[in-house]
A protein has these predicted regions:
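Pyridoxal 5′-phosphate
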Residues: 1-421
Length: 421
């Protein structure tokens, strides 16, 4: 049974957009529950991207011929679509290769611009993906700023109390950099409360998991920077975006140097191009950016509110059904802040074995491992009632999933438990 957001006819059209859902894996219908790692790709988006490459492609911004003009127009139109999608200005949107590049570029630029310097404090949470953890840790060792943490409880949940405790320990952080939604626990963070609590800090949001299913308004949230990836919202790999308030982007040193990002170059000095081009050195992933624009068109044609409600419905069902299994330990909150994914373990069975059996015997794609969040695994181990293996199984849904997919997962987990005793 699909989400009640779609009629049977509408859902049939959705399934037709993703041909891989019609294939079999090990003799079973594919049940794709690894959307937090990457989503499936839309036939419409791929078709339009192919047409762009075959009939309209050229390098951009550099020539006056027709193909260059067409390609540049498509590229800049995609930027405008991204800006509209998050309620920003187009000059505040910088194309990147994805969230990891966006955060790394931003961290390096903040440090090199002197906006984060020796003696400053950067506040992040204990549930961060390595992409929002490692850059801060490493650069703090070279530039002398401190990294402090909003602590998670033993379920991996960031609570209001933990945010307030961090406020009492770190009264005036220069930067607060936090995920919008944990890729391990599925918790959607209270961004508004964090903004209100740390009014004067530069607020950076890792939107990789959140933006595929929840509308983000950067102006309403008053975030300073937002990064996200296209491949987690059915766009191709290798494309993402960095949003920054124009007043802050103007102050930042570019993170890449080369062609197109300059205004004037002499043998002695350089002046930079205007926003956002001073951050887009060299030839960009033109086709990827254009495809990201097509992706936004497709998602908006479905109604993003419908997608959001669909994910909420599937998430609730996933959490409810897994909670009925007494041999399954679930991590993260058990309320409505738990969205789109669930990380869990089967008592007595290693996560890799669980995922392998689900794939081989049921055609279910899940993720097992530490999910690029090794420090969080040590937090979860403290509160675990089982012999915690420093990794988990993760099942994650998107709008093309069904309740039947979740039912098959539950049956698969019962089989796993019987098989391993």
């Amino acid at each position: 049974m699909h989400s009640t957001e779609w009629s049977d006819e509408a859902f049939c059209r959705i399934i037709q957009e993703f041909p891989v859902l019609n294939r079999e894996v090990n003799g079973k219908r594919l049940v794709y529950l690894d959307n937090a790692a990457s989503t499936l790709k839309s036939r419409t988006v791929i078709s339009k991207m192919t047409d762009f490459y075959l009939n309209h492609y050229s390098n951009i911004h550099r020539a006056v011929h027709t193909l260059a003009s067409e390609a540049t127009s498509e590229y800049e139109m995609a930027r405008e679509k991204v800006a509209r999608f998050i309620n920003a200005q187009s000059e505040e949107v910088v194309f990147t290769s994805g969230t990891t590049m966006g955060i790394n570029a931003l961290v390096n630029s903040l440090v090199r611009s002197g906006m984060v310097r020796e003696g400053d404090t950067v506040l992040i949470s204990q549930v961060e993906h390595h992409a929002n953890l490692v850059p801060w840790i490493r650069l703090s060792k070279f530039f002398g700023f401190k990294v402090e943490y909003i602590e998670a409880d033993n379920t991996g949940t960031i609570t209001i109390d933990s945010i307030l405790n961090a406020k009492s320990r770190v009264n005036s952080p220069k930067v607060v950099s936090i995920t919008g939604q944990s890729n391990v626990t599925g918790q959607v963070m209270p961004i508004e409360f964090i903004r209100e609590t740390f009014k004067d800090a530069i607020l950076i949001i890792d939107g990789a998991q959140l933006i595929p299913h929840k509308k983000i308004d950067v102006k309403a949230l008053n975030v300073d920077f937002l990064v996200f990836s296209g491949h987690k919202m059915i766009a191709p790999t290798g494309i993402g975006a960095l949003y920054g308030k124009s007043t802050l982007l103007e102050r930042l040193e570019p993170f890449l140097y080369g062609g197109e990002m300059i205004d004037k170059v002499t043998f002695e000095d350089v002046t930079f191009n205007v926003l956002p081009y001073k951050f887009e050195a060299g030839t960009q992933d033109i086709g990827g950016a254009v495809a990201l624009g097509y992706t936004i068109d497709y998602l908006e044609s479905l109604g993003f509110e419908n997608i959001q409600r669909c994910i909420e419905e599937l998430s609730k069902y996933l959490l409810e059904e897994l909670s009925k299994l007494d041999f399954v330990e679930i991590y993260g909150p058990r309320d409505e802040t738990h969205q789109s994914l669930v990380s869990f373990n089967v008592d007595g069975v290693h996560p890799h074995d669980v995922s392998q059996v689900l794939d081989e015997d049921f055609g279910i794609a899940t993720r097992s491992g530490h999910h690029c969040a090794q420090p969080l695994m040590s937090v979860l181990a403290k509160g675990s009632r089982i012999d915690f293996p420093n990794s988990t199984v993760r099942a994650s849904v998107y709008f093309y999933n069904t309740k039947e997919d979740i039912d098959i997962l539950v049956e698969g987990l019962k089989y796993v438990k019987r098989w391993f005793g």
